Curated annotation (Swiss-Prot):
Its main location: membrane. Residues 103-113 have a biased composition (Basic residues). GO terms for cellular component: ciliary transition zone; membrane. Residues 1-116 are annotated as: Disordered. It is a multi-pass membrane protein. The gene is tmem237. This is Transmembrane protein 237. It comes from the Eukaryota. Pfam families: TMEM237. GO terms for biological process: cilium assembly; regulation of Wnt signaling pathway. It is found in: Membrane; Cell projection, Cilium. The chain crosses the membrane at residues 209-229, 246-266, 282-302, 337-357. The keyword Transferase does not apply.
Length: 387
């Protein structure tokens, strides 16, 4: 009992290890926000993306340390005797644990906007544009535009654009130039295909009428020459053969040519498209129809005597060798030929007489001028009455 035991210095209770109780939170990688801007625009704008993909950690906040009471400290040392001793009132282990733990930042979710909300509704209807029934919106007219609706006063000068410049011109000069152009257009009208065809038709009709008159005179001259050379009662037929054999071939060819041309001219005056009307005109003694019929018959009769004309052209006396003529056969061969030439001359003369009485008659031209709607007016009236 000699010595008094000295108590050791009181040791502070160890702090609980945060490593054992609280697990360290691992740093999570932040998801990169979806950016609507394409990468090409970022590269063109000059922004370089960082190579480090780790998210930036938020700033660390110092956590205030709560001081424990003496009773709490003793209780902690009793329950956890393995806790380290705090030196100088500072806990190094706690600081290391605090540095390891990071606080999770709160993320603010952005609401996605629809495409229609990003742009203004340009096609929308405003309230001002809606007009109720019974109310019409009268546009306000500017008084400057009202003056243009008034009647303008005639001015003596006009401004005409010439060579990309406006030059003043008198009204009288412009009226004279317009009158001259109107006269020029009246003098030289435009020709159509119908005008050309009708003009050609008129020219051919005039030429054909002249040929018909010339044919009538030539046929009469031919028959007069034949009767003069044959003598009275056809007693001098050998004289006719010896004299006319030089004229037989050329005269007959010329007669055929005139007959063909006159026949075409006569048929051109009637409308051959309507054969019923042509036959009806022949029965009604139409001059154009009768002339065409006479010319056609004369042409057939003249062609029927072509062989006799050839024998007259090659005439040699019957006494010579190789002669086509036999003795005492001249009258038997020449008498029908003379009669037919006389009939041809009469037919041609009558046809010319009919045409000369009505030279302007032309049913083909009338058919070309009459419109299609006026062809059958009676039938149209009948259909209207039935309707």
């Amino acid at each position: 009992m000699g010595k008094k035991q000295v108590a050791p210095p009181r040791a502070l209770p160890p702090m609980p290890s945060l490593k054992d109780e609280i697990p360290l939170s691992r740093s999570k990688k932040k998801k990169s926000k979806s950016n609507n801007v394409p990468d090409d625009l970022l590269q063109n704008a000059g922004f370089n993306t960082s190579e480090n993909k780790d998210p930036l950690s938020p700033e660390r906040r110092k956590k205030k340390k709560k001081r424990l009471s003496i009773d709490a400290e003793t209780s902690l040392t009793q329950h956890n005797p393995a806790l380290p001793v705090v030196q100088n009132g500072k806990d190094t282990d706690n600081q290391a644990a605090e540095e390891g733990t990071t606080r999770k930042p709160r993320r603010r979710t952005k609401k996605t906007r629809s495409v229609g909300q990003e742009f203004p509704n340009e096609l929308g209807v405003e309230d001002e544009d809606i007009i109720p029934d019974g109310h019409t919106k009268i546009p306000e007219q500017n008084p400057a535009f009202l003056a243009s609706s008034l009647t303008s006063q005639p001015v003596g000068k006009f401004f005409v654009e010439k060579n990309r410049r406006f030059q003043a011109a008198d009204r009288s000069e412009i009226i004279k130039t317009t009158e001259q152009t109107d006269v020029f257009l009246d003098v030289k009208p435009t020709w159509t295909s119908m005008d050309v065809s009708l003009t050609a038709h008129h020219i051919f009709r005039m030429v054909g009428l002249f040929c018909c008159g010339f044919l009538a005179g030539y046929a009469v001259w031919n028959i007069v020459v034949v009767y003069v050379l044959a003598g009275s009662q056809l007693t001098n037929l050998p004289n006719l053969l010896q004299t006319y054999k030089i004229l037989a071939y050329p005269s007959q060819c010329f007669l055929y040519f005139l007959l063909v041309l006159s026949t075409i001219t006569a048929f051109d005056r009637i409308d051959l498209e309507r054969t019923a009307d042509a036959l009806r005109g022949l029965l009604k003694l139409d001059p154009a129809a009768l002339a065409s019929f006479f010319y056609f018959v004369a042409l057939i009769l003249a062609l029927s005597q072509q062989m006799t004309s050839d024998r007259i052209n090659f005439y040699t006396p019957p006494t010579e060798n190789g002669s086509l003529w036999q003795a005492n056969t001249e009258e038997q061969i020449l008498q029908p030929w003379i009669v037919i030439n006389l009939v041809v001359a009469l037919l041609v003369g009558l046809a010319w007489l009919f045409l000369s009485c009505r030279p302007d008659i032309d049913h083909t031209e009338e058919a070309m001028f009459i419109p299609e709607g006026e062809d059958y007016p009676d039938m149209e009236k009948g259909t209207k009455i039935q309707g």
